[in-house]
Design a protein with these regions (language model features):
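Short, strongly hydrophobic alpha-helical membrane anchors
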Residues: 1-7, 136-138
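N-terminal signal-anchor transmembrane alpha helix
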Residues: 7-35
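Physicochemical signature of membrane-embedded alpha-helices that form the seven-helix bundle of GPCRs
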Residues: 13-16, 51-54, 84-87, 112-115, ...
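Cytosolic, membrane-interface loops and tails of multi-pass inner-membrane proteins
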Residues: 26-51
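Core segments of transmembrane alpha-helices
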Residues: 56-68, 120-121
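Interfacial loop-to-transmembrane junctions
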Residues: 94-121
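Juxtamembrane boundary at the C-terminal end of a transmembrane helix
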Residues: 125-138
């Protein structure tokens, strides 16, 4: 991987996460056309799932982007930003696949959410605990 600063790494992962949101949004539009649902979900199960794929990503992604940027700004090394960003991105790619296989927690959905929550928890821990105990980033 190219050598980059922590802020550049945060920018890289933020850009990739934004692309995931765009892809999921386009899929919602395509589903709307296919299912002939103009507004809302129309009670259509396919439309509901498509909208939730996007909605779930839209709920978590801004938090992750903010955390990546804050970690970079306070001085964490780029490898930590890459690790958190890559893990979160992997979770955001896997999770919608799990929603494709009906109700209940299929393995892809569980793995996707685990890979979403884990980097968010690590980021939260670094942002909260380190300043409280005087631990320097890096």
């Amino acid at each position: 991987m190219l050598e980059m600063t922590a802020l550049q790494a945060a920018g890289l992962w933020s850009g990739l996460l934004i692309l995931v949101l765009v892809v999921l949004s386009v899929r919602v539009v395509m589903t709307r056309r296919r299912q002939r649902v103009i507004l809302g979900d129309g009670g259509d199960e396919v439309m509901i799932v498509s909208a939730r794929r996007f909605g779930n990503a839209a709920e978590y992604t801004p938090v992750a982007i903010g955390a990546l940027i804050l970690l970079a700004l306070i001085g964490w090394q780029s490898w930590i930003i890459h690790l958190i960003g890559a893990t979160f991105l992997l979770g955001r790619v896997i999770h919608p696949l799990g929603l494709a296989f009906g109700k209940g927690p299929p393995p892809a959905r569980v793995v996707g959410m685990t890979l979403t929550w884990l980097p968010l928890l690590v980021a939260a821990g670094l942002l909260i605990v380190c300043p409280l105990v005087g631990m320097a980033p890096g």
